Amino acid sequence: MSRWERLEIEHAFDHYQAAALKGAQTKDWTDWAACFTEDATYFEHHYGRFWGRDNIYTWITATMNKWPASEMTAFPVTWYTIDEDKGWVIAEVMNRMTDLGDGYIYQEPNITILHYAGNGVFKYEEDAYNPHNME
């Protein structure tokens, strides 16, 4: 028997995605940071590791409100899988940039790994991507 129901994890992931979109559009990352436990770990391959929701919030706010990250407008998910037995979500997330009006969508893929903690929040996130693709 699984520790969590797939639907519970999926709802948490949906909420996480909505909070990320809101953060990108408003530059307020409060709701996104609230998707994590107080003692969560965030491993971002380019920037390093962050421990605790407050540190994650401080980092994401500073990073996403500064160019070039401030030009990210959305994070559409192209695919994901959920392991409800262990609480893992693995997804390909596109880092979509501002529309330049030339008919092309500028975006680069990111692999996001989330570990569910229960109660609608995650205790771990890891993002893997090549930052040179965004230059």
Where are these regions (language model features)?
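Short, low-complexity N-terminal intrinsically disordered segments enriched in polar/charged residues
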Residues: M1-A34, E38
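A short, polar/proline- and glycine-enriched secondary-structure boundary/capping micro-motif
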Residues: D54, G101-Y104, N133-E135
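Short beta-strand edge/turn micro-motifs at domain boundaries
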Residues: Q107-E135
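A solvent-exposed, acidic/Ser-Thr-rich amphipathic alpha-helical stretch
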Residues: L7, W29-V89
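Short, mixed charged/polar active-site loops
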Residues: R49-F50, I105-Q107
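Generic short beta-strand segments
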Residues: E92-T98
